[in-house]
């Protein structure tokens, strides 16, 4: 396998495993925890390989500007994600299905913690490796935005988030996009736990 093929493979693998397990396993707290754990076990060596052999995460900029840009854009995406829910037209036309379930609030606290950590620190990073590290190079900016949008039930704000994360990856580096996505998912999870707006999960 060539260096490029290896780099592409480890960029795709964590997200592919996450999606495969999501499709194949039932939507239960236990299966979500298993999916998070398996993906994390795969994600960590993939991140190490990309950084150690190719420097694709931390290239061409210092850490502090990436952190600032990532946090700012991440919080902006959070606001964009939550704010439109108040409008009937948005809930009718811009959300697939029922827009989430309220059953999560009946789950055990352990599951809530796993859900928060999995969303913030596992799937967000796996998505950035797949969409911004690999797919955007292969398919281009706008097709990546479109595919990122349809992956989410809230497709309109998903598209906006995809544009912002993609812009960060291009202008500030992949690490900045990862920090933004982690910030959004972590802050959204804390918002859900605080307010009980379980539809966002």
Regions found by a protein language model. Name each.
Residues 22, 26, 39-50, 77, ...:
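Structural signal for membrane-spanning alpha-helices in multi-pass inner-membrane proteins
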Residues 104-201:
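Transmembrane helix-loop-helix hairpins at the membrane interface
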């Amino acid at each position: 396998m060539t260096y490029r093929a290896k780099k592409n493979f480890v960029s795709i693998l964590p997200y592919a495993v996450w999606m495969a397990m999501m499709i194949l396993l039932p939507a239960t707290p236990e299966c979500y925890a298993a999916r998070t754990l398996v993906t994390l076990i795969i994600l960590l060596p993939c991140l190490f390989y990309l950084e150690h052999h190719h420097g694709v995460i931390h290239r061409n900029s210092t850490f502090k500007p990436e952190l600032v840009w990532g946090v700012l854009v991440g919080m902006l995406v959070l606001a964009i994600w939550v704010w439109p829910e108040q409008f009937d037209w948005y809930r009718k036309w811009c959300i697939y299905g029922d827009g989430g379930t309220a059953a999560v609030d009946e789950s055990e606290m352990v599951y809530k913690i796993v859900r928060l950590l999995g969303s913030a620190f596992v799937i967000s990073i796996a998505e950035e490796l797949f969409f911004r590290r690999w797919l955007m190079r292969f398919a281009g900016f706008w097709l990546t935005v479109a595919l990122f949008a349809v992956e989410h039930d809230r497709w309109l704000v998903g598209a906006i988030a995809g544009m912002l994360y993609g812009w960060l990856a291009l202008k500030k580096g992949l690490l900045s996009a990862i920090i933004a996505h982690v910030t959004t998912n972590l802050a959204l999870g804390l918002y859900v736990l605080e307010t009980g707006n379980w539809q966002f999960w």
